[in-house]
Amino acid sequence: PHDLARRQRQMCIRDRLTDQFRIFTAEKFIKSLEGPDSTQSDIVAGANRDRLYVFIGRPQEWDNENNPPTPIDSFQEFSDSYDDMISMKRVLASDAIQVVRRIDWIPPEQTTGGLGYVYDMYRNDYSSSKTASSGATKLYDADFYVVNSSYQVYKCIYNGTSPSDPNGKPSTIEPTGTSTSIITTADGYRWKYMYTIPVGQVLKFFSADYMPVLIDTAVQSDAVGGEIDTVVIQSSGSGYNNGTYENIPLRGDGTGGRISIVVDGGRIVSATVTSGGSNYSFGKIVVDEVNGIGSGTGSGGAIDVIIPPKGGHGSTPAIELGGFRVMINTKFTYSEGSGDFPTDNDYRRIGLVLNPFKYGTEELADAITLSASNAVIFSPDFTGSFN
C-alpha cells in the first residue's frame, strides 16, 4: 500500500496541464456563456447558460497608492473582493474570444540589416533536441504564423530550411491572398492562408500582444486530414546517382503520398511533394531504398516528412495556432445602468464573478449592469453628511 501511494504521488508530480487541455478549457469557457442554444432567452436557458460579470471595486485607498499589494489567491482575498465590490457588468459570449500571440509579418527594411526576418516553419516534432529557428522547443512557442498588413493570417508551411540553411531563410515578400491552396512566394516561403480578421474584431480584440483566432469555412472545408504538404532534406548524403526520381511512395499509415527527389553531384538537392495523399499520422522516406538512386554506393541521405495537424491545415485554427488564452472586452460606459455605476468613485480592483444571484434570492442574475453596493460603511471618526 505504501508503494502504491508513493507511485500515485509521483504520478501527480509528473502530470502537467497540457496545451491541448487548456485550449479545450478556453473553448468550453466561451461556450458556457452562450449555452446549448444561443437563441434562447436567459429565462429559457436557465442554469445551462453561465452569467459572467466583470466587477470594479476597492474605492478606499491602498496603504501605498503607488505600490498596491500583489493579489493573493486565498479565501480572505476572495472575501475582501466581495466586501469592496462597487458595480458589475455582464460579459456576453460576443465579448469573449480565443486569442493567440500576435506575430506580425515584418518588412525587410524594418529588420536588422534590412535582410528580413526568419520565421519558424510548422513542424509537428519540435523538442529540446529539435528546436525551431527561433530556438523554441515546442510549436506554440515558435513564430510559425504571421498576420499581414491586411489582417490576413498565414501559417508558415516551409521557410527554406535545407542542409545549407538549417534555420531557414529570411522572409522578404509579404504573403497575400486567400487561396485555399498553399501560397508560394518568390523568396521560397510557402504559406497556408488561415483566416482574415474582420474590422470589428480588429477593433475589439486585436491588441499589441494578442489577436483573435477565427475559422474561415472555405479553408476548413478544403482541408484534407493527414495530407502531406512538406518534406525537408535533413541530410543531402553523398555518392548517389544523379537524376530525378519521381513517384516515390511515402511509407506510413496513410495512402496516396508521393514525392520527387533530385540528385546532382551525388547529393540530394531537392525533395518535393507531388501528391499529398491523406490520413497520414506518421510517415517516412528511406532514401537508400529508392530504386536506382544508390546502387550500393550512395549513403547518408535523410528526408523528414512533416505531419500536418489532425484534420489538415486550416481545419481547427484554435488548436493549430495555440488558442489557449481568452480575451474579454467589455466597456464601462459613463453612468450606465441607471446608477449601477457611480461616477464619483475611484476603483482599484477589477475581476470576474461567475453566476451571481439577484440580491436576496437564489435566482441567477441576468441584467447587463448590476450594483454590488448593499451598504456603506463609515469609519468611526467620519464627520459630514450622506445622501
Regions found by a protein language model. Give the residues of each.
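Single conserved hydrophobic/aromatic residue that forms the stacking wall/gate
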Residues: P1-D15
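Conserved, function-critical positions that sit in or immediately flank catalytic
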Residues: T185-N387
